[in-house]
Amino acid sequence: MKHLVASSILGVFVLTPSLAMMNIRFNHPLYGSFGTQIIHIGAFQGMVSIRDNNIFSEWDGILDYKNALLVAKVFNKMACVLARMDKAVFPSLDDISKALDKQAFKYYPSTRGLTYTVLPSWVKNLAQYGKPIKNMCRDDPTYFAQQQKEGTALAIDSNSCFEIQLLSFMGLFICGETPGL
């Protein structure tokens, strides 16, 4: 019994610092380097969370790499948009992490011009997309969006589009004629 207690206490003292170092290694906050964005990478969870406090385009977002989902909460529209993330087009979680570590954004291909069209259907059960997405969007209507194929002409008023900029290499447009957007 004494050995069990001693090994448990030793395990706590040995494991706790190593787990703390792992947490620091996998979570890279970026404060103010790109205007008002704060970026948090949780590599273990496979998620990137973004907060942009720009008064002209305030939004929060989650890139869920494990489930290939992206969600954006657009504050001035009081709505959330949920879409499938095309992993072939988006920088990998590792690329974003390396870019934050090295501030080497110029080496990553631009995704400017990706356009998502908001569909009129609401997301009825946010819980199925995970707790972070549910918590972000629980107080606002959440709509599905679909990525437009490159070169496809939009039959949407360009004034209905909202631009989301992540770092310097990812620009997205969310367009739609849905209430709130």
Swiss-Prot record:
Signal peptide positions on this chain: 1-20
S-S pairs: 80-137
Domain called BRICHOS: residue spans: 53-145
Keyword field: Disulfide bond, Secreted, Signal
Protein name: Gastrokine-3
Organism: Homo sapiens
InterPro entries with a match to the protein in the record: BRICHOS_dom, Gastrokine
PANTHER family in the record: GASTROKINE 1 (PTHR16483)
GO biological process, one term: regulation of cell population proliferation
Pfam families: BRICHOS
Functional description taken from the UniProt entry: May inhibit gastric epithelial cell proliferation.
GO cellular component, one term: extracellular space
Location in or out of the cell: Secreted
UniProt key word Phosphoprotein: no
Gene3D superfamilies: 3.30.390.150
Family: Belongs to the gastrokine family.
